[in-house]
């Protein structure tokens, strides 16, 4: 199992993604979030073929569902990228490593 903890930023919402794959290709997700929009996104995601997902890139299942659910300021949410990376690791097409985005205002 792959577990990813995502802290989305200034909104303060937290998301935990648990991903399993019995065959290193087809990935089942369990997503818990304090954000109702991410919970709605999670409800749209069934099992995902990691090979198809990585090949489709921005047109894959995760990011397509994110575009449908996350509108306005939520369109910049980091959680969908975290879900996508978790699918990659669970499917064996990427290695686990921390990712981060740091935003600072330097006037």
Segments from the language model and where they lie:
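Short, charged/polar N-terminal "headpieces" of proteins
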Residues: 1-27
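Active-site- and interface-proximal helix/loop "cap" or "latch" segments in soluble metabolic
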Residues: 22-84, 94-95
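C-terminal charged interaction modules
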Residues: 80-107
